[in-house]
């Protein structure tokens, strides 16, 4: 494995740094970056060392980063990298690293990297940025159902400490930012060059991370492959405060969904996955682990992407176990093809399909939305049904205080979404948690819709925070 080492202050990750890191990564199998500690950097350190290290660790090209609290020469002697990369401006200066590298055959290279995009830091800021201005509170809907902001804040405060178990398909989402170069001369295809990439926890994993970030005690059950993507997912789960019971399936890779984007538009999506059901041994392990946790669990969430983690036999067994333990249950089953049947999650307290998923489940392309919702609710025996309609909002088919089913619509609360990925996950988890702690379906719909509006305000799946939701009530 070829290793490359880079070191520096990195007060601000400007485009020059990013080009240098990209150049270094292209030379290596493993890019290691040493960030000078406050002690070593001295007056050159304008930002605390922890923040500078975090900035480097967030870069998609960096495989390993650490605080460098000794001389660069000593670190090179310990690491023995194949190559050390420095900026072009150091080429005519004294470089004591050269003598050490020469001792064991290492190389010292100088480069700023190929200049491909001068505003990459702006892209990064754009990805992290959250646009609260475009989020609307559903005032008319709230008035129809006597939903007050004070009550919603009260519901949010009750989520703290709720015990949640999430079972489903773990996914890692990768956003590859590209610069378009033009049309190919050989065929009618667009030519791009990748200039940045960022990975996010997705699928059922982000559902568990949302729950934990909102204050719940989240346990997560799933499978991964024996690969770097799986290691990334495990690290993200643990950093989010989730307790993972995630098992390696040697027959499959960790599901990775790549989005290649340019100028804020997605050009292409590539999914690396196996859709076969998990084997009987893994199925038995997950069943036993979930069974063991259910007596102390208040909410059980199924997050199904039809990638094999939730075969019907396991689903049926877990539903029966949840009912025996009086656990509140919610489910979403996403169908990216003509496969999928959300109604297989029967007897749920909350079901959150899209219109397409509902029609696939019922094989019904004719009925209107209200009739469709009623039929699916009856077919799946769901207490509450949130039918997601994308930019048109959501249709609710839910029980009121008198135990009668009512239908209403809540509009989409963000008319200018930047990335719709993950909206359904945030709706599912906050809707389920809200109803589980005593909220009405209408209150849960308000909170879930606000969560979705926040999620689509930014690029990539990031765990929801309570303060983000509370800010919408100010």
What is each model feature region?
Residues 379, 383, 413-472:
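Conserved post-catalytic alpha-helical subdomain immediately downstream of the catalytic base
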Residues 1, 141-181:
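Positively charged, low-complexity intrinsically disordered leader regions
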Residues 172-301, 462-474:
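Conserved N-terminal subdomain of the carbohydrate kinase-like
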Residues 30-37, 87-88, 219-224, 329-333, ...:
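Short internal beta-strands
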């Amino acid at each position: 494995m070829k290793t490359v080492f880079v070191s520096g202050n990195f007060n601000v990750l400007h485009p020059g740094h990013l080009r240098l890191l990209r150049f270094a990564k292209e030379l290596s199998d493993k890019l290691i970056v040493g960030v000078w500690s406050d002690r070593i950097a001295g007056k050159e350190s304008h930002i605390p060392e922890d923040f500078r290290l975090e900035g480097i660790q967030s870069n998609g090209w960096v495989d390993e980063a650490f605080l460098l609290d000794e001389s660069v020469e000593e670190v090179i002697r310990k690491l023995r990298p194949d190559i050390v990369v420095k900026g072009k401006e150091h080429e005519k200066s004294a470089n004591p690293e050269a003598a050490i590298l020469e001792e064991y055959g290492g190389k010292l290279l100088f480069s700023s990297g190929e200049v491909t995009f001068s505003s990459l830091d702006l892209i990064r800021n754009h990805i992290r940025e959250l646009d609260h201005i475009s989020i609307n509170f559903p005032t008319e809907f709230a008035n129809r159902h006597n939903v007050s902001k004070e009550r919603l804040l009260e519901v949010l405060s009750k989520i703290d400490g709720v015990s949640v178990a999430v079972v489903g398909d773990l996914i890692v989402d990768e956003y590859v930012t590209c610069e378009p170069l033009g049309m190919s001369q050989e065929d009618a295809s667009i030519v791009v060059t990748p200039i940045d990439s960022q990975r996010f926890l997705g699928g059922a994993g982000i559902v568990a991370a949302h729950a934990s970030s909102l204050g719940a005690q989240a346990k997560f059950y799933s499978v991964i492959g024996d690969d770097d993507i799986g290691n990334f997912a495990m690290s993200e789960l643990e950093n989010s405060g989730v307790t993972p019971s995630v098992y390696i399936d040697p027959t499959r890779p960790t599901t990775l969904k790549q989005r290649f984007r340019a100028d804020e538009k997605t050009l292409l999506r590539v999914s690396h996955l196996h859709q076969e059901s998990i084997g009987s041994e893994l199925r038995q392990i997950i069943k036993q682990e979930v069974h063991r946790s259910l007596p102390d669990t208040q909410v059980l969430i199924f997050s199904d992407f039809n990638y094999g983690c939730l075969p019907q036999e396991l689903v049926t067994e877990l539903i029966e176990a949840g009912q025996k333990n009086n656990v509140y249950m919610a489910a979403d089953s996403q169908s990216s093809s003509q496969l999928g049947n959300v109604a297989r999650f029967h007897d749920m307290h909350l079901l959150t399909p899209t219109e397409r998923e509902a029609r696939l489940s019922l094989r019904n392309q004719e009925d209107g939305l209200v009739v469709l919702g009623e039929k699916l609710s009856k077919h799946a025996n769901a207490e509450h049904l949130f039918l997601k309609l994308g930019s048109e909002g959501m249709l609710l088919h839910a029980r009121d205080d008198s135990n009668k089913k009512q239908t209403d619509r809540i509009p989409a609360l963000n008319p200018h979404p930047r990335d719709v990925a993950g909206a359904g996950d945030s709706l599912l988890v906050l809707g389920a948690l809200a109803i589980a702690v005593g909220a009405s379906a209408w209150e849960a719909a308000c909170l879930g819709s606000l969560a979705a509006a926040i999620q689509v305000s930014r690029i990539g799946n990031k765990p929801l925070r309570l303060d983000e939701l509370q800010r919408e009530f100010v």
